[in-house]
């Protein structure tokens, strides 16, 4: 296959209609987008790198300093070359990898017209030049059509939505989607009308099953274009600003892996104690992380993404609340590092165990725990036992680190079930209540194992999170029904519905490269253009989670006030109910 790059439309044309709206703090982004080739890549790398470093630094003035006249971002822009088309060196392609864009597009070394062009190219047949004139005309039509569609998606999902919202405006996503849908229809009509069966001669049939119709193959191609453009815009443009409790906190975050085993229970093979491999995110110090690389998550040896945490660095002194997080069915302990690292940056210790026999790594190895529904809550109680033991063990890393009276639990999907089980009464599988857990935050939980009266037995503060288009644990049966049967009386008894969120919106699955997602599954439950942008959704989850645990475990009245229905009504894409 030969790669034909879609060139000729500079990124400046994408953002020019909203240039005035991007004045001030957004000007650096605009300048990067208007700069072509290697220089544009370097510019955006400097922009993203400087801002992200600031947002993870304890100095609150860092970001304003790098944005100031003559600051680091102005220096980056001063180094950019004139916008000319040039070949992309391997290093340029790697810059896109630094931006974590490699999973969003077909990466190309052949040419750089501007950095947005690097996000999309199409593999045409090697012998395209030998084809009939109608196939060549079709190829030119396809290039023009998908370029226009891509630019529409980036414009509508980027400057017109995220930047306006970030600057206090409103993003009309229905209008955005309508514009994209209209351009998609025009592209579809042009390709089908001017190509016909010549489309298949371009070598694009691999994008759709062989048995599909021509219309389905064209639709698949256009879906790829929309997906790449939408996710590119999410990466470049920041989501809505919900205030400091949605932002990274004052503590740099450390992470370490604890290799634990529960001798009172057997592993899935019955050959030894049950392993409880656990990732722990904790508050660190600026001195401890200086010069240290950020932690990189790897699965099967494949580097997935860089995290905001630093491995095995020193812990900040003092006692902190403990929050346990239970992953979903077939998930893994670091599936929601965005959530764990956020809480840790605000002064929580967050322990996220692997549930042995119920991770996707275990599944690949043929390790299955048929009793996972009962073992999961026992894993969580075992972890509490361990941390309380660490607390009084001289010389242990977590000695005097956890406040035993401030313990909360959260979990996603099957982990949401686990959270319910820890704070409710008995049900068909038994009773797993752990009175040490003082607050519960189930995320897109599975509630089907529980009868209605089970939820009336929950007396601790609880905030249930769910997505309106969750196809795995649908909202009415798994989030609304539990909430409807909860009794009022606790400090917080709430239900937060994220409009447009899917099941895996509450995880970091959209950070995973697509080729691995096809193995894991989940793309269609979080990462499609129809979904609430996952970075904005994560901001909402972090805002709700931090204020909930701050209000309940730390007794913070300001945090409790932020969770009132009146205040939460101002958050776009959130529907909140309370008892």
Indicate residue ranges for each PLM-predicted region.
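Soluble, non-transmembrane alpha-helical interaction regions
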Residues: 21-239
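Short substrate-entry loop that stabilizes the transition state in hydrolases
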Residues: 287-288, 305-363, 471-476
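Conserved alpha/beta-hydrolase "nucleophile elbow" surrounding the catalytic nucleophile
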Residues: 327, 411-417
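Alpha/beta-hydrolase active-site loop
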Residues: 345, 369-404, 409, 421
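Short glycine-enriched nucleophile-adjacent loop
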Residues: 388, 416-431
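A conserved short beta-strand
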Residues: 430-446
């Amino acid at each position: 296959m030969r790669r034909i790059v879609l060139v000729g439309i500079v990124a400046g044309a994408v953002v020019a209609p909203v240039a005035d709206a991007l004045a001030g703090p957004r000007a650096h982004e605009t300048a990067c987008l208007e700069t072509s080739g290697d220089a544009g890549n370097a510019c955006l790398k400097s922009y993203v790198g400087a801002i992200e470093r600031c947002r993870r630094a304890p100095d609150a003035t860092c970001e304003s300093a790098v944005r100031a006249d003559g600051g680091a971002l102005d220096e980056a822009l001063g180094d950019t070359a004139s916008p000319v088309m040039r070949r992309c060196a391997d290093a340029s392609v790697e810059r896109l990898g630094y931006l974590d864009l490699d999973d969003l597009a077909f990466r190309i070394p052949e040419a750089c017209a501007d950095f947005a062009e690097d996000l999309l190219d199409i593999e045409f047949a090697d012998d395209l030049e030998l084809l009939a004139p109608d196939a060549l005309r079709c190829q030119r039509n396809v290039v023009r059509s998908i370029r226009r569609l891509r630019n529409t998606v980036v414009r509508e999902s980027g400057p017109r939505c995220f930047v306006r919202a970030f600057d206090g405006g409103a993003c009309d996503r229905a209008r955005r989607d309508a514009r994209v849908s209209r351009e998609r229809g025009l592209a579809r009509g042009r390709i089908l009308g001017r190509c016909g069966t010549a489309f298949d001669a371009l070598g694009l049939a691999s994008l759709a099953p062989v048995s599909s119709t021509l219309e389905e193959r064209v639709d698949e191609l256009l879906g790829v274009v929309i997906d790449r453009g939408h996710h590119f815009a999410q990466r470049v443009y920041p989501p809505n600003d919900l205030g400091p409790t949605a932002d990274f906190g004052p503590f740099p975050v450390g992470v370490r892996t604890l290799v634990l085993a529960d001798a009172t229970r057997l592993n899935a093979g019955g050959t030894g104690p049950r392993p409880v491999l656990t990732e722990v995110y904790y508050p660190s110090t600026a001195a401890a992380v200086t010069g240290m690389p950020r932690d990189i998550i790897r699965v099967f040896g494949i580097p997935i993404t860089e995290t905001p945490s630093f491995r095995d660095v020193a812990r900040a002194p003092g006692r902190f609340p403990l929050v346990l997080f239970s992953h979903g069915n077939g998930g893994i302990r670091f599936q929601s590092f965005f959530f764990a690292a956020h809480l840790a940056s605000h002064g929580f210790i967050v322990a996220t165990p692997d549930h042995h026999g119920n991770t996707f790594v275990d599944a690949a190895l043929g390790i299955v725990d048929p009793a996972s529904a009962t073992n999961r809550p026992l894993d969580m109680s075992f972890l509490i036992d361990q941390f309380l033991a660490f607390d009084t063990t001289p010389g242990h890393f977590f000695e005097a680190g956890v406040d035993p009276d401030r313990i909360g639990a959260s979990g996603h999907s099957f982990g949401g079930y686990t959270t319910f089980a820890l704070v409710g009464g008995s049900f068909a599988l038994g009773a797993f209540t752990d009175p040490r857990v003082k607050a519960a935050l189930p995320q897109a939980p599975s509630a089907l194992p529980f009868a209605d009266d089970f939820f009336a037995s929950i007396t601790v503060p609880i905030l249930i999170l769910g997505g309106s288009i969750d196809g795995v644990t649908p909202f009415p049966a798994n989030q609304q029904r539990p909430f409807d049967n909860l009794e009022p009386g606790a400090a917080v008894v709430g239900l937060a519905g994220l409009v447009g969120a899917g099941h895996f919106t509450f995880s970091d699955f959209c950070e995973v490269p697509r080729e691995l997602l096809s193995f894991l599954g989940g793309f269609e439950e979080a990462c499609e253009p129809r979904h609430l942008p996952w970075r904005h959704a994560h901001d909402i989850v972090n805002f709700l989670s931090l204020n909930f645990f701050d209000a309940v475990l730390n007794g913070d009245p300001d945090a409790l006030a932020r969770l009132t229905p009146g205040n939460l009504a101002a958050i776009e894409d959130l529907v909140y109910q309370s008892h």
